């Protein structure tokens, strides 16, 4: 093949960029199994679409399920976890890459740095903290990465109403809710992460 033919062939080859999707979710061992199943399905969908999973690096509850789901489809998993949680045997040692950090703050910063998009599943205060930090970062234009809430069970409906209420009293600027994509299925959430 001549040099000009090789250049032409290369120009026709699509350049695919690797997508890393971070998921914020529960590590509570007492949540309903439907939330664990949802996490597993989301992990499987992320891997099925050729993306890598970035998570909090835990092996229990929804956090563990999301990684198992990704691995069930051959996906790469990257866990970011503070040493303190490794010490109490919370770490997902099956992760393809387990990054141990010194604090929760460092964990969140590393997840934000590695991820190209963020999906939040139903969760508790830690999950909400992660969501709010990414959401506010998007609002302040520290990043322009997609932020998605996957909530087929309506857990976050009161949050949506609260933000709307805060908006009516001018504590939150109009359009803040529009910075979040709301999804009701893993397929929809991952599609939104890709901007579809």
Predicted regions and their residues:
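Acidic, Ala/Val/Gly-enriched low-complexity intrinsically disordered segments
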Residues: 2-5, 9
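Selective for proline/serine-rich intrinsically disordered segments
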Residues: 9-12, 120, 144
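A cross-family phosphate/adenosyl-ligand binding-site feature
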Residues: 10-114, 152-196
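Short, structured loop/turn "capping" segments at alpha-beta junctions
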Residues: 77, 142-145
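Active-site/ligand-binding-proximal alpha/beta "capping" segment
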Residues: 106-141, 148
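Short loop-to-beta-strand entry elements in the cores of soluble alpha/beta enzymes
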Residues: 145-153
């Amino acid at each position: 093949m001549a040099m000009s033919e090789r250049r032409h062939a290369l120009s026709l080859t699509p350049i695919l960029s690797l997508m890393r999707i971070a998921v914020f979710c529960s590590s509570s061992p007492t949540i309903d199994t439907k939330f664990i199943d949802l996490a597993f399905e989301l992990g499987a969908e992320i891997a099925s679409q050729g993306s890598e999973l970035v998570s909090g690096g835990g092996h229990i509850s929804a956090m563990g399920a999301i990684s198992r789901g990704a691995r069930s489809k051959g996906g790469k998993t990257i866990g970011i976890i503070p040493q303190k949680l490794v010490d109490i045997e919370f770490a997902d040692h099956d992760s393809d890459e387990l990054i141990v950090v010194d604090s929760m703050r460092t964990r969140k910063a590393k997840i934000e740095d590695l991820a190209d998009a963020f999906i939040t599943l139903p969760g508790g205060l830690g999950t909400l903290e992660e969501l709010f930090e990414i959401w506010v970062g998007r609002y302040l234009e520290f990043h322009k990465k997609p932020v998605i809430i996957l909530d087929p069970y309506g857990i976050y409906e009161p949050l949506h109403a609260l933000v709307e209420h805060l908006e009516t009293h001018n504590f939150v600027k109009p359009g803040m809710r529009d910075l979040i994509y709301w999804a009701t299925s893993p397929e929809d959430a991952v599609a939104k992460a890709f901007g579809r």
